[in-house]
Structure formats: C-alpha cells, structure tokens
Amino acid sequence: MKIRIAARGSKLSRIQVDMLGEKLKKIGIEYEIIDIKTKADLFSTEPLSKLGKGVFEKEVNEAVLEGKADIAVHSMKDILSEINPSLEIFAVLERDPPYDILIAEKNLDKLDSNITIGTSSIRRKNFLKYIKPEINTKDIRGNVDTRIRKYLSKEYQGLILAEASLKRLNMTMNYHRLNVYDFTPEANQGIIVALGRKKDEKIKEIFKEINHKDTLDEALAERAVISLVGGGCHSPIGVLFKKEGKEFYGIASYSDGKKKITVSISKPGDPYTIGSELGLLLKKEMKNENIIP
C-alpha cells in the first residue's frame, strides 16, 4: 500500500514528511509526497499578520478533503485550534525540543541595546520587549536558511527561532535556548502531525501504529488552552505541557510587551480537562488585568 502525503514544498516540510515516512516504512507502508503551494508560500514577503489564519495549512488540507492526497503533514503549531470537521488527527511523532532559541553573538542577558532581532511572531516580540525593552524587533519571512543568511549578512543582529527547526534541518549554528518562563513556546511547537479524513478507517488504523501517545496528550492539553484564550502565530500567548507518567506539568503566558502574566498547573488527569483548567486560570488573570472583558 502507498500513502499519498500532502505537504508544503519547503525543505523543512520535506524533511518532516520523510521523518513520518520512515515510521511508515518500518511497518511496511510506502509513501509518496504531493507538494502543495500555500498562501504563505505565494506571499512569502508579506508579514504573517496580514495574511490571516491558516496560511500554512489550508491548501494542504484541501488536497486531502478533495481526495488528491490521503494525509496532510504539518508542523502542528501551524494548524488552527479548530480543525475542519471532516478531518482528524491520525498521529503525531515524538516531540522534538519545543523551545524558542536565540541566534546571536551573546546570550539574552548580555545583548547590547538598540540592536535588531528578527522575528515575525507577536508572541516572541512581546516577550522580548517585556524582558529587554531597549531591543528592537523587525519582521523576517522566508525559510530558516534565508533567515540565517540575513543574520549572517548583518541585516539582523539576532534571530529568534524554534529549536526544532534547526534540529530537523541538521544545522549546527551556535544558539542560546530561551527559558520557558521568559519565552513560553507556541502551542504544539516541536510536534509533527498527520491529519486524515475521518471516514478513512483503514488509513486511521495504520497511523495508530506510529502515533506517540504522550506527545499527543501534550498537544491536546495545549490545544485546550488556546481554544479558550487564543493562540498561534498571531497571538501573544504561549503554552507548554510536559507529561511524565500520568502527571501533566503545564505553563501558559501572555504579554503585551509591558506586562506579563504566567500561570502553571501540575496534576494528573486527561489532556482536555487539564488544558481547560490551565486556560481558565490564564483567562481569569487576563480579566483581572483588564486585558479581556
């Protein structure tokens, strides 16, 4: 049997598909890749904030819904909290490091004033502004290779990226891992997900064999948070869960650049309940600070 996998045509997307494909090969399943151009690819120089939601996933998911592919593969942080009702999460791979990293000559504490750090994420911009208000940020688009090239050409004095991207691309840049209390990652950062059609029971059963349950539980808990308070590349909210045995350890943070709210939780339970509880904690604190009505 051969599975048709839809994904963006970028180098990183190809690597992510091949990571999943290797898991399929181990259970005797072949795969082929179907390259899809997304809105984010077609408007690669536009700020993400101007492109709307779902810019990395919509066209890829449509290929599955239209029967042109069997599976859509994404970096899970790029998919909306509300998945198309005809689609379902079939599997996730074991999580890569979920952290944000700083690529710069010095670590965060020792950065000079008035330098420019490249990031298009409002979450990263606000967290950085809260810690280091004297540092400037500037939007940066393009794949990881392009961003690093701009940094090396001194267009930026630093970059903030996802550590998982560098790991998957096997890049050996020196970097500084950012503390999760200072830079709480975007929900589902570091997770590769496979989406399929709900009705495809045969394919769904195949993907159960490669699913990493603890990672899926962490992902679902984080998604429960953002379904209550918002999240994604347009949101100033970060959330991270770590599951150890039956225990969930979670942190969620919000910042507008001037003030910061962080809440945490540690308890056993099911992902949705634990995530919802953390989301309600953050929502309560945001209301107390008059951030939301």
Swiss-Prot record:
One of its GO terms (molecular function) is hydroxymethylbilane synthase activity. It catalyses: 4 porphobilinogen + H2O = hydroxymethylbilane + 4 NH4(+). The keyword Repeat does not apply. SUPFAM superfamilies: Periplasmic binding protein-like II (SSF53850), Porphobilinogen deaminase (hydroxymethylbilane synthase), C-terminal domain (SSF54782). Keywords: Porphyrin biosynthesis, Transferase. PROSITE patterns: PORPHOBILINOGEN_DEAM. Pathway: Porphyrin-containing compound metabolism; protoporphyrin-IX biosynthesis; coproporphyrinogen-III from 5-aminolevulinate: step 2/4. Its EC number is 2.5.1.61. Disulfide bonds: none annotated. It is an enzyme of class 2 (transferase). Binds 1 dipyrromethane group covalently. One of its GO terms (biological process) is protoporphyrinogen IX biosynthetic process. The keyword Iron-sulfur does not apply. Its cofactor is dipyrromethane. The modification S-(dipyrrolylmethanemethyl)cysteine is found at C233. GO terms for cellular component: cytoplasm. Tetrapolymerization of the monopyrrole PBG into the hydroxymethylbilane pre-uroporphyrinogen in several discrete steps. The porphobilinogen subunits are added to the dipyrromethane group. Belongs to the HMBS family. This is Probable porphobilinogen deaminase. It comes from Saccharolobus islandicus (strain M.14.25 / Kamchatka #1). The gene is hemC.
